[in-house]
Amino acid sequence: MAAHCQVTGAEPGFGHSISHSHRRNKRRFDPNIQKKRYWVPSLRRNVTLTLSARGIKTIDVRGIDSVVADILARGVKL
């Protein structure tokens, strides 16, 4: 599963783990990605989305129809 949110566009960040002695090791900071299934009344079907935690909250506030319309407008196939 790709670490990419379909709503917010959140992607992994890169940086360093820093030990107590301040040695640095490269690492990757992954977003909190979840697969979530929603019923979309306008499409009359279920849609499975790959979402970050913030993307799930966005759907709670704006509604699934509005968010799916934006995703489809970007040309992403659902």
From Swiss-Prot:
The keyword rRNA processing does not apply. GO terms for molecular function: structural constituent of ribosome. Residues 1-31 are annotated as: Disordered. GO terms for biological process: translation. GO terms for cellular component: ribonucleoprotein complex; ribosome. Keywords: Ribonucleoprotein, Ribosomal protein. It comes from the Bacteria. It holds the Pfam family Ribosomal_L28. Coiled coil: none annotated. Belongs to the bacterial ribosomal protein bL28 family. This is Large ribosomal subunit protein bL28. It comes from Paenarthrobacter aurescens (strain TC1). The lineage of its organism: Bacteria, Bacillati, Actinomycetota, Actinomycetes, Micrococcales.
